[in-house]
Amino acid sequence: MNINIVKEKIKLHKYYLITIIIMFIIIIVLGFFLLTKENNTFTNPYEVKVSPNDNFLFLGDSITDFYPLEEYYDNLPVVNSGIAGNRTIDILNDMQTRVYQYNPTKVFLLIGTNDLDSSTEDIVDTTFDNIKEIVKEIKDNRSDATIYVESVYPVNSNVENNSVNNRTNKKIRSFNKKVSNYCDGDNCIYINLFDDLTDEEGNLKEEYTEDGLHLNSLGYVVITRELLPYLNE
């Protein structure tokens, strides 16, 4: 065999070998880059999501859920974390999703009316205990957040096709009194909206509701007027 042909084959084999090695290195580097990128974009569901600006969280049940916050609080950083049908225990069981992930600077808590629909004798005390636990957990996990606890709103069983069920204003007033006393101990800021919504007989004003329980647009106007100073302070 011609010596030149042999040399040419050797050179060709070296070329192939070098090419394979280079491609192998490129594959390794590319794989490492993609793996690093994937790890960097992984989101830990329990990681604190820090908001660089103010973040005002409205936390509650259907009354909050149905509250069109962006419409009433234009250009304010409001977040709606209301879920229809919720009770205090539902919030306690889901604090990460309902509160912590938003890293709020202010929390407006309105919860308890669905608890008070129960006919259990100790329901007022049980609901109050859960309120205290919600406040405590927020303070422990978001110590810089200011916590506002709204009074549970009044109801009106005289409205046709009402949704009041076992709720009574007597029971609601008893609950609100406990919460008010608790917040006076610097645990939170109590906002009494009960009185702003009641008529002369102590019921939810009919012009503020369609079913005796939930607010209509006029009712939300009243609430917004009372809450706005707290958002702006």
Residue positions per predicted region:
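N-terminal secretory targeting modules
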Residues: M1-L59, L69, N232
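Extracellular glycan-modifying ectodomains
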Residues: N2, K9, I18, V79, ...
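Conserved SGNH/GDSL esterase-like catalytic core that processes O-acyl groups on lipids
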Residues: E38-E133, K170
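Feature marks short, surface-exposed loop/turn motifs that line or immediately flank catalytic pockets
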Residues: R87, D115-D117, Y153-N156, L197
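Sec-exported extracytoplasmic/periplasmic mature domains
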Residues: Q96, Y100, G112, K136-S143, ...
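Alpha/beta-hydrolase-fold catalytic nucleophile elbow
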Residues: L110, E150-S151
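Charged, glycine-enriched surface loops/patches
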Residues: T126-E150, T168-C188
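Catalytic His-Asp segment of secreted/periplasmic serine-dependent ester chemistry enzymes
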Residues: P154-E233
